[in-house]
Amino acid sequence: MERFREILIDIALSKTIPNYQDLLDEGKKRRDICAYFDGKYCNKFKVSRGNVPASWISNNKMVPHPIMCFVCPYFSLRYYEGKQIELDLFDILLYYEELKETIEKELIFIENKMNETGFSLLLKRRREELISLLNDVVTKIKVLKELIKIFR
């Protein structure tokens, strides 16, 4: 049954998300090295509703679908003691929307600075890093919007 739910999620998302398999592979890598994943369940999220991207849900715990691990903002290599939080896709989307806005503001600031002072290797490198991060955030926002359409 666990695999069935995962396959249904894959079918629904693979049609609407370009390079879905790459994102799925990245999510699997993140899940396998995340400090909150104990090999069976995600210990960061508490699940009280069944409308979340999980391969399996049992006793308020979930086996996260790899695409959930791809968009998870709590991914960590170190375990931080803290309470479990209720999984809410809208909260995660809001987090990424705010992050996107912050990155865009910093990009504008850097571009203005580059226009004023001329070429700066440090500013150019920071700008490239921010553009890469922005692309990653935009991808996660698109994935989250698709997940919300499916699981609302």
Question: Where is each model-derived feature located?
Answer:
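Cysteine-centered metal-binding/redox modules
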Residues: 2-128, 132-152
